[in-house]
Swiss-Prot record:
Homodimer. Interacts with FtsZ. It is found in: Cytoplasm. HAMAP family: SepF (MF_01197). Cell division protein that is part of the divisome complex and is recruited early to the Z-ring. Probably stimulates Z-ring formation, perhaps through the cross-linking of FtsZ protofilaments. Its function overlaps with FtsA. Keywords: Cell cycle, Cell division, Cytoplasm, Septation. This is Cell division protein SepF. Belongs to the SepF family. It comes from Clostridium perfringens (strain 13 / Type A). Its main location: cytoplasm.
Length: 149
């Protein structure tokens, strides 16, 4: 009769002993969990970057004497330099051809070409924004607001 009672207890889950296979599996699971513990090191491998070198803008001021100087200007623009071009020493037709050539290169490189004064131009690459607010303000009001009220 005790066999019947023990079978009934084991069937209902009230048996007093554990299966050896279950004990071994639980130990293996615990060992696996312990083996995956994170390893923390006190040494940090941080990368130090100088933030001031990334935004260094270079400016080139040129006064071309011949049309062939346009290639030098376009190379500087391609290297992301801001170029100020003074064409006052060139003939009008040569200056116009030079500005047309530089303007085409500027368009191809997504840059910007603006006239600062008569015969003086600024060419900026795509990563530089040139504001023209002062020029429009000066043309409307003049340098000083001397108008009497």
């Amino acid at each position: 009769m005790s066999k019947v009672v023990s079978k009934m207890k084991s069937f209902l889950g009230f048996d007093e002993f554990e299966d050896e296979d279950e004990v071994m599996e639980e130990e293996e699971v615990m060992e696996e969990e312990e083996s995956f513990a994170p390893v923390l090191s006190s040494k940090k491998n941080g990368k130090v970057v100088n933030i001031h070198t990334a935004n260094t803008a270079k400016l080139m001021i040129t006064k071309p004497l011949v049309y062939d100087d346009a290639t030098e200007i376009c190379t500087a623009l391609k290297n992301r330099k801001i170029v100020v071009i003074n064409t006052t020493s060139l003939e009008l037709r040569t200056a116009q051809r030079l500005i047309d050539f530089v303007g085409g290169a500027c368009y191809a490189l997504c840059g910007e070409l603006q006239e600062v004064e008569k015969g003086v131009f600024i060419v900026s690459p795509s990563n530089v924004e040139v504001s023209n607010e002062l020029k429009s303000e000066l043309s409307n009001k003049g340098m000083f607001n001397w108008a009497s009220k």
